[in-house]
Amino acid sequence: MTRSAMQMGRLTLVLCLLLLLLLTTQACFIRNCPKGGKRDVDERYLFKACMSCSFGQCVGPRICCGPRGCEMGTAEANRCIEEDEDPIPCQVVGQHCDLNNPGNIHGNCVANGICCVDDTCTIHTGCL
């Protein structure tokens, strides 16, 4: 076997090993990486329960809602700001309702007659 044939064989072997390594790794490349990197968030747990507040759940920053209504801007409701610091979004418990609010129309019934989205709440007949 000639010297150039041996070098060609080694080069082919190295290329095959690199290809095998590339195919067996679970690397994320520029186009398919999640925002925080491949180890950032497990896709099975994209949502978690929202924080609880004085008498219900946090439905947005400074908004606490429960069976007897909603509090906005109170000391207890201001605890809900902490929810925004968590990179994993929370899932508000309640029946879905639609608002006429541009860009953010899908909300949840959080109290009797009240529908909320991330930053606002309104009276909604579908939540009775």
Curated annotation (Swiss-Prot):
Signal peptide location: 1-27
Gene3D superfamilies linked: Neurohypophysial hormone domain
UniProt keyword terms in alphabetical order: Amidation, Disulfide bond, G-protein coupled receptor impairing toxin, Secreted, Signal, Toxin
Tissues/organs with expression: Expressed by the venom gland.
UniProt GO molecular function: neurohypophyseal hormone activity; toxin activity
A Gene Ontology cellular-component term: secretory granule
Disulfide-bonded cysteines: C28-C33, C50-C90, C53-C64, C58-C80, C65-C70, C97-C115, C109-C127, C116-C121
Short name of any one Pfam family annotated for the protein: Hormone_5
InterPro entries: Neurhyp_horm, Neurhyp_horm_dom_sf, Neurohypophysial_hormone_CS
Propeptide cleavage-removed residue intervals: 37-44
Subcellular location: Secreted
Post-translational modification Glycine amide, affected residues: G36
PANTHER family: ISOTOCIN, NEUROPHYSIN
Domain notes for this protein: The cysteine framework of the conopressin is C-C.
Similarity remark: Belongs to the vasopressin/oxytocin family.
Protein name as catalogued: Conopressin-conophysin
Species annotation: Conus geographus (Geography cone)
